[in-house]
């Protein structure tokens, strides 16, 4: 299985995961999830994310490897953004390729769910001119 895991402070490119996962017909399915910075209350002016370099990538790689074994993936792409972002900015990309669509859907959801609960990211929101840790 080919794997790409990264944490970056630059803007995410929407087509990059699917371009990277293309495998000349080996996979019958590719599923891509893009998460955006959201502001449900109409108050968040910015979001700032920090992480522990090295540890974060290791946790993400472990999650991807676990998904790859469970669903026999051909490829997986996980990129998470850190730094300061605005509502609507892409913050995370998770994409997988597999022989069949059900495996791709399930693995993509699994990776995203574990990423939200296990990856060591710390965030604060800028509201009304002040930063607040979330």
Can you describe what each PLM-predicted range is?
Residues 94:
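Phosphate/diphosphate ligand-binding glycine-rich loop within oxidoreductases
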Residues 1-90, 98-109, 113-134:
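N-terminal, polar/charged subdomain of small-to-medium soluble alpha/beta proteins
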